[in-house]
Curated annotation (Swiss-Prot):
This is Disintegrin and metalloproteinase domain-containing protein B. GO terms for cellular component: membrane. The gene is ADM-B. Its main location: membrane. It comes from Arthroderma benhamiae (strain ATCC MYA-4681 / CBS 112371). It holds the Pfam family Reprolysin_5. SMART domains: ACR, DISIN.
Length: 799
């Protein structure tokens, strides 16, 4: 029985390892143009600023002669109050830990403006920068947008280090200065049919080398009718490498992707904060002059990436912890940090790939006990032209599934983690890979739209309900492209609907009310801190807000709350107790109403998992569902529509079947909702069956194999009956009477009278006064006549 339980555990674990999806990003193509940032001016009296300054920064773009103005303010969201940096030694042990002082990092956000010929300024986009040097000759890096075309500002030294062979060369101007390139300056890959061609290797985010990717049903047509056919086997024989992409974990059907395009239902109405952790490995740290510079670059990357999440999902990405490893890579990777090694240093030969780094880093992340949304490993290594890799739909997931084995390249560990390689547009790679962790699939491009494995354009996010190709304009584009600064309406609808359906976790997302920031109390940072009634941001952001005074962060006269930051606030007054602040999503998720004396909406409460909510339906993660219903939702289009049922009731991977073909198993990188019943009396949790017991496992196995059990029971019963019958028959035979010789009966004579005997009886001795000696129980001789006894004793016949 112990072995049986162990076997079930192994099978369940192995099955769970085919439920998630990884996504990988590839390096950009060559640059057609690059500009130098000329005449930068900080518009303050002394040309000096500090980390908490509000100021304008202007400069020219040579040779375009365009004047740009960045209107900037501190971005206090990028660092949490207790943000810290931990310095590790080469063995992975903690050397020291320091608090990240907000005043040491001049990180800013704001708006980009262009100057017309008339001299008037027009706002054309957003800006996120980090200032390295102020004064008369400032030096900064970051990104800003002009009409949705991103402009990347980088230092000359960084460009030289990461310059592609066919990028424009630089002149011999000495010293450090700033360069700029646009997304539209990147050479675009040309494609003809299914063959992609470019001067550089194809820049894409394909996810076809790890088992999680290969097991994705949403990249394949229906399976051929074979017993126990799996997506993995079908993939190995029918789909080429370049025809794949990832699916982002638990993906709604094609109808759902189209129906939710542009919908923000499910995303937070008020600002939420996602705390993240970042680790810099030795190869990444080695690209900087100091550990301080490495830390600043990480902050700059998160600062730039956060803006697209704030605009799309009302979620800020905030650094909670940074771990920095020494720049000298160890000769042999430590068991504590196996991901920290040279790019081509893998035991047993070959290269230590980006997938290897993700696996080992995920195992490391799984041991962390924090409440971070995810962790990112920053590295300077790539695999061919791949520069990013992430597990999909792992937001807020704690722990790890699986275990990487250095001797087995196919072994995987899945956690809330990703890997990002250092490039000159790292922030985009970071934002793209984080999008997969939030559960986004790729946007459709021309290749996916023409792929026969993508019927009805259901395996990617289409541009509209009637148009497939998104033309490479958005953050989840599978290949590099220009003007990528936002998520597509389809990606927004998908992520928000996943939050609403609870197919991704959001428990780690915190509110921005009562959050302590690294800088302490700062009015105007958009976070309501101790001592503040409200905080709508700077004066530009607070335009039209009549509830909050942006200068004092106090309610205006007569106001009780702030409509922009409190869900139970209407017209600066508390909403009535009959006001619904969070609607019901079904029988298992009751609506929440305002209290009438607070601006906050009560906590979201849903029915207990396992409660009955309909015929053959139970609550799971706030949804009224069943295993069959989830199969119909996720794989119905590929199997049998509304007739689709679950293949079994044991595991937590979505495995379905057509009742007319019960031996054909349809599966993919899908998991049942948390709280869905699974084998052994357990429930699904992050794709694994937890809470099962050995007794229930045995009972469940019996119920799932009734024909076998009945056959064995009948056979054993018959054998038992035969054994009992045999015993009864044997006992009956032993009790039957039989003719047999009777043993002689010796009787002690009483005063016998010997007639015809000569002398005394045989063997007799003369009596003595002391009594008689014992008799020897010897019968009389056969020929001797029997003795005569007095009385009428019956005679005994000896035979």
């Amino acid at each position: 029985m112990k072995a049986f339980s162990c076997l079930l555990s192994v099978i369940a674990t192995a099955a769970s390892l085919f439920q998630h999806v990884d996504a990988r990003s590839h390096a950009r193509d060559k640059l057609n143009n690059i500009s130098r940032v000329e005449r930068p001016v900080i518009h303050t009296p002394s040309r000096r600023v500090h980390a908490h300054s509000h100021f304008d920064l202007t400069f020219d773009l040579y040779p375009r002669s365009s004047r740009i103005k960045l209107q900037l303010e501190p971005n206090h969201d990028v660092l949490s109050h207790d943000a810290r940096v931990t310095f590790l030694d080469t063995e992975g042990n903690v050397d020291r830990t320091e608090r990240i002082e907000r005043r040491d990092h001049s990180v800013f956000k704001g708006w980009a403006w262009t100057q017309a010929k008339s001299g008037a300024w027009e706002r054309v986009g957003w800006a996120r920068i980090i200032l390295h040097r102020d004064g008369e000759d400032p030096l900064f890096e970051g990104v800003f947008t002009v009409m949705h075309d991103h402009h990347q500002v980088i230092a000359k030294s960084k460009y030289v280090r990461k310059r592609h062979q066919q990028d424009p060369p630089l002149d011999n101007t000495p010293g450090e200065y700033m360069l700029l390139f646009r997304g539209s300056d990147i050479a675009q890959t040309q494609s003809t049919g299914n063959v992609e061609r470019s001067i550089m290797s194809s820049p894409s985010c394909d996810a076809d080398t790890l088992a999680y990717d290969s097991n994705s049903n949403f990249m394949f047509p229906p399976l051929p009718e074979e017993n126990n056919t799996s997506i993995w086997n079908y993939f190995m024989t029918s789909i080429g490498k370049r025809q794949m992409t990832d699916t982002g974990g638990v993906v709604p059907g094609s109808r759902d992707l189209k129906e939710t395009i542009g919908s923000t239902s499910g995303c937070p109405n008020t600002r939420k904060v996602a705390l993240i952790g970042v680790v810099a490995d030795c190869t990444y740290t080695n690209t900087f002059a100091s550990e301080m510079d490495a830390r600043a670059d990480i902050i700059s990357v998160v600062n730039a990436a956060s803006v697209v999440y704030e605009h799309s999902f009302n979620i800020s990405l905030t650094l909670g912890e940074i771990n920095i490893l020494p720049k000298n890579c160890p000769a042999t990777a430590s068991s504590a940090t196996p991901f920290n090694q040279q790019c081509d240093d893998r035991a047993g030969g070959g290269s230590f790939t980006l997938a290897d780094r993700l696996n080992t880093f995920s195992a490391w992340r799984g041991k962390k006990t924090d409440d971070f949304a995810f962790w990112t490993l920053m590295t300077d290594c790539t695999t061919e032209n791949q520069v990013g890799l992430a597990w999909a739909a792992q937001l807020c997931v704690k722990g790890v599934q699986g275990n990487p084995d250095s001797r087995n390249s196919s072994s995987q560990a899945v956690a809330g983690a990703n890997v990002v390689s250092k490039t000159d547009n790292t922030w985009q790679v970071f934002a793209h890979e984080a999008g997969h962790i939030f559960g986004a699939v790729h946007d459709c491009d021309s290749m996916l739209c023409q792929n026969p494995a993508n019927p009805d354009n259901s395996r990617c996010c289409p541009a509209t309900a009637s148009t497939c190709d998104a033309r490479g304009r958005f953050m989840m584009n599978p290949t590099s492209g220009s003007q990528i600064t936002d998520f597509s309406p389809c990606s927004i609808g998908q992520i928000c609907s996943r939050m609403a359906r609870r197919t991704i976790l959001t428990s780690c997302l915190t509110t921005n009310r009562g959050v302590d920031t690294i800088s302490g109390q700062q009015c105007g940072n958009g976070i309501v801190e101790d001592g503040e009634d409200c905080d709508c941001g700077d004066e530009e952001s607070c335009k039209g807000n009549t509830c909050c005074d942006p200068k004092t962060c106090k309610y205006t006269s007569g106001s009780q709350c702030d409509d922009a930051n409190e869900e139970c606030c209407k017209g600066c007054k508390f909403a009535s107790s009959s006001t619904i602040c969070r609607t019901s999503s079904g029988p298992c998720d009751p609506e929440e109403k305002c209290s009438g004396n607070s601006g906050d909406c009560p906590h979201d409460i849903h029915s207990k998992d396992g409660e009955t909510c309909g015929t053959d339906l139970q609550c799971a993660s706030g949804q009224c569902t069943s295993r069959d219903l989830q199969c119909q939702m996720h794989l119905g289009n590929q199997v049998a529509g509304s007739r689709t049922v679950a293949f079994d009731s044991y595991g937590c991977e979505v495995a379905c079947k057509d009742p007319d073909r019960p031996n054909v198993r349809y599966e993919g990188s899908l998991t049942f909702l948390d709280g869905t019943p699974c084998g052994g009396g357990g429930t699904c949790k992050n794709g694994q069956c937890s809470g099962s017991t050995f007794g229930n496992e045995v009972s469940d196995w019996v119920s799932r194999h009734k024909p076998i059990v009945i056959g064995v029971a009948v056979g054993a019963g018959c054998l038992l009956l035969l054994a009992i019958a045999s015993c009864i028959c044997g006992r009956s035979r032993r009790q039957r009477p039989r003719n047999r010789k009777m043993p002689p009966i010796n009787m002690r004579p009483m005063a016998p009278v010997y007639n015809g005997w000569n002398g005394a009886p045989p063997n007799a001795q003369q009596s003595s006064p002391g009594g008689h000696p014992p008799y020897n129980n010897i019968p009389p001789p056969i020929n001797a006549p029997p003795p005569a006894y007095p009385g009428h004793l019956p005679s005994t016949r000896y035979a």
